[in-house]
């Protein structure tokens, strides 16, 4: 056995041992789901405005924010954002100030203030942050009403509520209620931010969108909006009642809305605006559920937007089985049991566009019962040995197949939620957040699941999905990944999915993708891509390689190249060097919630994807030796 193979086996053994030690008693794994400072800042604002005296929690949240502030006073959404981000800096500044632990006169606060003012002030922050500031009396509400009658119009209307994505809806409802009621939680302990912007605007277009949208043709959208505003007042009141019911019906057992901290925080404002007492059980439980999401990410206090328990457990269990751990091993069976218990069995919002399917999918977080998605479902189906729970497994597969979009691709949460009018909304990131279209990463990952499940390559749904991928390949040979960073992620998902479904190495799309991956490899054997790719919609290299992206690229190449190919061996060599399991290569965020706003560091990813790449390398090496 060569040195590289010995080192691979040694690293596999070490990683497997670590995962045995860190598995929870219920079979799950709990790794940090680390996003931006938004959650810490927003909870501080809410708690301080409510007069919540949980000083220890507020201090921890503020500590987490301060730890992310850079020496120049700015905050950024990802490490190589050299200039800083005005929205993140406003969030951090407002959160620190509202905590009562920092004053405007401190040097780091003065630096942040100067950066914000020099970048146009509060008017240039993302509209969700403007909303949060307005809900706390720190920014004026826009001269705009959002017609909540929108919630009660039937699906036959050209534009209706369920043509928005599920993650847009769950945030839109409390935001719209609070905005329409012009509700603000004002507390003298939340200092004014008037010094950051002397010309705060009520202009609805400036309030909702960025300047780059000025020249968009919105006439068709406004025509439908005008019709909504002409609906009788009684329907608007019905809309308010419907909004309240919509929120209350989607509260999870722990009190959170859809298990999201952000949506739950917004819901508290929405319910208060509707007259619900701050001392009511629903609000007390919502606050308790949100507070419980506080964790420690590398010794830094952080409020997770949700747990990632189902996702992490599914990915890790699959990676362990691929690394040679028997599916009878207690580590595997206990994780499978945990996952089986979280299969969703109720008809929820996904059924609006998919009314004939039986439930059976899985969601992302530990307590999610309302919001299954295709990515988690595909991951869980690969992570549960079919023989253990055959009925559950078949039900999950049936649900997943039913979620294929009419264009042949797969999206995250719902089916055929890609209406062109919604794309026209004058909101920042509407293209990313308001719709849920087919994506290359979801389509590739579902294909991988279907291929591993034994569906034949000529299965009509597989053929449609493969054709979707081929149609959506970029000119350079890559694929854009929506939920990971970014072109490396999309290309890995597409290639592994197509290989699992029998697409030949001689296919032009495969050849083109392999060429592209080789062309962007770094001299040290690594691959690294910036989060900026998601903003520019073109590949932007990092100045260094990351462990996770190198694992993606290496595994993608291994689908179609020999293990002794130079690009493969250099990539694997990078993965087995201990120094890459710390520092920037280890910690760079490679997940995406919302481009420009919410990048994610999944603390499980280095273990998941290095294991997968290394196990693929070892299995292919063994096959090549046999030949």
Predicted regions and their residues:
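Preference for long, amphipathic alpha-helical scaffolds in soluble/luminal domains
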Residues: 1-627
């Amino acid at each position: 056995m060569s040195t590289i193979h010995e080192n691979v086996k040694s690293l596999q053994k070490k990683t497997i041992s670590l995962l045995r030690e860190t598995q929870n008693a219920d079979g799950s794994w709990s790794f940090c789901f680390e996003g931006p400072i938004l959650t810490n800042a927003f909870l501080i604002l809410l708690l301080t405005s409510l007069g919540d005296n949980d000083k220890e929690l507020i201090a921890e949240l503020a500590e987490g924010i301060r730890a992310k502030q850079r020496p120049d006073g700015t905050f950024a959404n990802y490490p190589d954002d050299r200039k800083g981000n005005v929205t993140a800096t406003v969030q951090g500044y407002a959160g620190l100030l509202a905590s009562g632990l920092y004053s405007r006169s401190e040097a780091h606060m003065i630096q942040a203030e100067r950066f914000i003012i020099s970048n146009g002030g509060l008017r240039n922050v993302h509209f969700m942050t403007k909303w949060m500031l307005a809900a706390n009396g720190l920014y004026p509400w826009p001269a705009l009403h959002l017609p909540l009658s929108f919630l009660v119009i039937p699906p036959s209307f050209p534009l209706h509520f369920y043509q928005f994505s599920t993650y847009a809806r769950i945030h839109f409802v409390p935001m719209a209620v609070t905005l329409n009621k012009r509700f603000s939680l004002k507390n003298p302990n939340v200092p004014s931010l008037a010094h950051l912007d002397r010309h705060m605007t009520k202009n609805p277009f400036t309030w909702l969108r960025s300047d780059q949208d000025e020249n968009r043709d919105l006439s068709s959208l406004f025509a439908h909006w005008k019709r909504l505003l002409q609906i009788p007042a009684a329907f608007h009141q019905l809309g308010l009642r419907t909004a309240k019911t919509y929120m209350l019906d989607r509260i999870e057992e722990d009190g959170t809305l859809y298990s999201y901290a952000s949506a739950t925080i917004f819901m508290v404002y929405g319910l208060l605006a509707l007259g619900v007492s701050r001392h009511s059980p629903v609000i007390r439980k919502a606050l308790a559920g949100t507070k419980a999401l506080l964790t420690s990410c590398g010794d830094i206090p952080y409020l997770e937007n949700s747990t990632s328990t189902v996702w992490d457990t599914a990915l890790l269990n699959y990676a362990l089985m691929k690394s040679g751990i028997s599916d009878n091993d207690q580590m595997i069976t206990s994780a499978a049991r945990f996952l089986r218990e979280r299969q969703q069995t109720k008809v929820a919002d996904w059924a609006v566009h998919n009314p004939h399917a039986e439930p059976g999918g899985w969601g992302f977080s530990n307590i999610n019962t309302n919001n299954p998605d295709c990515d988690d479902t595909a991951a869980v189906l690969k992570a549960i040995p079919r023989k253990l729970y055959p009925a559950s497994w078949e039900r999950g597969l049936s649900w997943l197949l039913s979620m294929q979009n009419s264009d042949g691709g797969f999206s995250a949460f719902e089916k055929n939620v890609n209406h062109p009018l919604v794309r026209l909304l004058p909101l920042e990131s509407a293209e990313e957040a308001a719709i849920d279209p087919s994506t290359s990463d979801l389509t590739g990952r579902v294909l991988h699941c279907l291929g591993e499940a034994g569906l034949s390559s000529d299965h009509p749904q597989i053929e449609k999905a493969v054709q979707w991928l081929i149609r959506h390949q970029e000119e350079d040979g890559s694929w854009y990944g929506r939920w990971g960073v970014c072109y490396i992620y999309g290309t890995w998902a597409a290639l592994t999915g197509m290989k699992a479904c029998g697409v030949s190495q001689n296919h032009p799309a495969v050849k083109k993708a392999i060429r592209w991956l080789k062309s962007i490899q770094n001299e040290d054997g690594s691959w690294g891509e910036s989060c900026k790719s998601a903003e520019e919609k073109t590949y932007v290299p990092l100045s260094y390689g990351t462990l996770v992206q190198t694992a993606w690229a290496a595994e993608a190449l291994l689908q179609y190249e020999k293990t002794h190919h130079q690009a493969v061996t250099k990539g694997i060599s990078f993965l087995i060097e201990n120094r890459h399991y710390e520092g920037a290569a280890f910690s760079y965020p490679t997940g995406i919630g919302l481009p420009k706003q919410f990048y994610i560091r999944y603390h499980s990813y280095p273990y998941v994807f290095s294991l997968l790449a290394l196990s693929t390398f070892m299995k292919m090496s063994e096959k090549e030796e046999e030949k």
